[in-house]
């Protein structure tokens, strides 16, 4: 069975909705506010010396940077798959997931990251940008793949709560997809070696280790992006007669779903080199646009030089 490490407020709240029996779920946070209603306290790890991070990555890093081994000694990683679930924009979850990712790499355990993005403030966008760069840094330093499934809570609606719910549901769907892939009672022609090679495609292709994006999509031809390359593809289908559509990847594995309640499945997960870089460029552009507008709107300040030494004006 796979593990889910729910990191930070968003990760914890999404993980509470995971169906019983799909995964071993562990909760890691810097605050008790989201952990109070978890009945099994043996599955909870609270970072000492903190009461939330206030969207400050550095605070979480300083308090947790040496705790990855401790957490994974208490919550033993799965040999099948480990999911790190968090937002990308808060001060706790993203940094917790990055530090745990580093330890999972050290222990040679398979993992993917599921991250929920947010665009509700420039601080959140900057946090996400820094986290994506961190994933690239971790990959480069450890010469290992860091595969990230990003769920985007931005659309044209004005209801921010609705958008967040959609992104949370999409992240939950991602968890369910990987739970299916690790459930041998509902699948055939797919094993741990296939999943490992999909994640660590550098072992079976001529590609170098990289920080990549995972894209869950219907099995259909997708527009080509000159900045990205599909290094590995995982075809999930209920029919042995279906082939992949579009350009072939460097590595392909297929999972046949035998669950009778899933009798018309035909989709895939693309493991995309260059996807993280594309997303980094996107955030850099958005932040630059925000700062440009902010600077344009900044007006000349009001003179209060007549205030007394305590700042009061009479």
Regions found by a protein language model. Give the residues of each.
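Tubulin/FtsZ superfamily GTPase core signature
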Residues: 1-314
């Amino acid at each position: 069975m796979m593990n889910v490490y729910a990191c930070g407020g968003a990760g914890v709240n999404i993980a509470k909705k995971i169906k019983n029996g799909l995964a071993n779920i562990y909760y890691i946070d810097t605050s008790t506010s989201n952990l109070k209603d978890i009945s099994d306290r043996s599955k909870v790890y609270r970072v000492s010396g903190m009461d939330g991070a206030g969207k400050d990555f550095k605070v979480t890093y300083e308090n947790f940077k040496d705790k990855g081994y401790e957490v994974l000694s208490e919550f033993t990683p799965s040999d099948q798959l480990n999911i790190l679930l968090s937002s990308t924009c808060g001060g706790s979850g993203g940094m917790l997931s990055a530090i745990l990712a580093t330890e999972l790499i050290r222990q040679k355990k398979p993992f993917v990251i599921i991250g929920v993005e947010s665009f509700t403030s420039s601080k959140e966008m900057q946090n996400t940008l820094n986290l994506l760069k961190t994933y690239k840094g971790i990959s480069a330093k450890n010469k290992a793949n860091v595969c990230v499934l990003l769920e985007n809570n931005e659309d044209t609606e004005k209801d921010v709560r609705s958008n967040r719910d959609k992104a949370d549901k999409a992240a939950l769907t991602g968890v369910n997809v990987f739970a299916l892939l690790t459930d041998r009672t509902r699948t055939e022609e797919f094993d741990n070696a296939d999943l490992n090679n999909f994640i660590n495609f550098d072992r079976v292709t001529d590609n170098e280790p990289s920080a990549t994006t995972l894209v869950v999509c219907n099995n259909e031809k997708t527009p080509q992006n000159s900045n990205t390359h599909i290094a590995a593809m995982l075809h999930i289908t209920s029919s042995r007669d279906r082939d992949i559509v579009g350009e072939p990847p460097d590595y392909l594995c297929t999972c046949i779903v035998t669950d009778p309640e899933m009798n018309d499945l035909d989709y895939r997960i693309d493991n995309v080199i260059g996807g993280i870089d594309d997303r980094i460029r996107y955030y850099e552009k958005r932040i630059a646009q925000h700062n440009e507008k902010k600077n344009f709107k900044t007006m000349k300040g009001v003179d209060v030089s007549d205030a007394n030494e305590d700042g009061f004006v009479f």
